[in-house]
A protein has these predicted regions:
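Conserved beta-strand-loop-beta-strand hairpin that lines the nucleotide-binding pocket
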Residues: 1-4, 49-127
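Helix-loop-beta hinge of the Bergerat
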Residues: 2-30
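Conserved ATP-binding N-box helix of the HATPase_c
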Residues: 29-57
Length: 127
């Protein structure tokens, strides 16, 4: 399994760069356009919720039909609460609902100093 590591500022100025990298990685695995877009949206939304201060590590593990993405450390506890708490109300659009729609699985891992890591997995459809 190949692995790619990236450290990026959380600043909004770098989100387009991250989107480009995520798209390139998914394209390498022959993901369909909508699958590429889904993975880009998941990472983008997660970074938007994380604020703009500091930096974050993003690692990508590339399988034959999947990308596992690990994002952190994130200091925004509201992310963990949104992903691990009760389901959103009908019609409420939050991070959890977005991730449930665009990735195949996600999870939250606790790290040192109260930070968290979020794990995302996107599978390529069989063709």
């Amino acid at each position: 399994m190949d692995r790619i590591e990236l450290t990026t500022p959380l600043s909004r100025d770098f989100r387009a760069v991250v989107r480009l990298i995520v798209g390139g990685i998914a394209e390498t695995l022959d993901f369909a356009f909508d699958e590429v877009d889904d993975l880009q949206l998941a990472v983008e939304r997660l970074l938007a919720e994380a604020g703009q201060d500091g930096s974050v590590n993003i690692s990508f593990q590339l399988g034959s039909r999947s990308v596992r993405t690990h994002v952190g450390p994130l200091r925004e506890r509201a992310i963990a609460d949104a992903l691990q708490g009760p389901p959103p109300e009908p019609g409420e659009l939050n991070l959890r609902r977005i991730l449930e729609a665009v990735v195949d699985s996600y999870g939250v891992e606790d790290a040192a100093d109260g930070a968290i890591y979020v794990r995302l997995e996107k599978l390529r459809e069989a063709r």
